[in-house]
Amino acid sequence: MLWQCLEQAVTERLIPYNPANGCRLPKKEKKKMQIIPPEKIRDYLKAAEEWGVLPMFYLELSTGLRRGELVALLWSDLNLQTKTLTVSKSVSRGKGELVVTEPKTENSIREIYLSDEAIRLLVEDRKNHPFSPYMFPSPKTGGMYGPDCVGRIHKKLLEKAGIEEHVRFHDLRHTFSTLAIQSGIDPKTVAEILGHASAEFSLDVYAAI
């Protein structure tokens, strides 16, 4: 847009030449992806178990769900017969209240196959709150966790597990991607699990490991 305006100014003889000619934007440096070091994942999950949130964070590390998707899960989203989890909504905080919305893209609406261990943990945890519609109800309110609250718990788990790396909650998606690709799952499948339109993100992960 700026280049075109300057070209027009040259045409109208307002300036002698276009100063933007030959200018190149600096290459955008890709941020190095942070993940939980594989050798520390056991410590992280142990911390989650001691904190009483193992099912939630085990599911996160085995699916790479977005934070809002994780806290929006209902028990009706889990199909025990097909061992699948339907991801069709997300939670965000707006004007101090939790708001449930549909995903922004069609690719974000998806079914994910769960491992037997993930299902076992979820079913066992269900016994603690059998009448709640939420998969992970807040022990304080009985309602949904706020996404920010889950982020704070994640930080506590890192501290308890002695993980010094600066790993954001969102980086758990990178952790899942890394582990999935290293285990032989193709980037396209990983992208589908994550709810991405293409495998580009997964390929970036592959290039970084």
Predicted regions and their residues:
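Non-catalytic DNA-binding core/recognition domains of DNA-processing enzymes
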Residues: 1-8, 114
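C-terminal catalytic core of tyrosine-transesterase DNA break-rejoin enzymes
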Residues: 11, 54, 58, 62-69, ...
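Short, flexible, glycine-rich and Lys/Arg-enriched loop motifs at helix boundaries
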Residues: 89-107
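Catalytic-site neighborhood detector that most strongly recognizes the C-terminal catalytic loop/helix
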Residues: 27, 35, 91, 194-209
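Active-site/catalytic core of tyrosine-dependent DNA strand-transfer enzymes
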Residues: 39, 82, 90-93, 115-164
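A short, basic/aromatic helix-end/turn motif that makes direct DNA contacts
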Residues: 72-78, 191-197, 207
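Basic, Lys/Arg- and aromatic-enriched nucleic-acid-binding interface segment
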Residues: 11-75, 80-81, 92, 107-109, ...
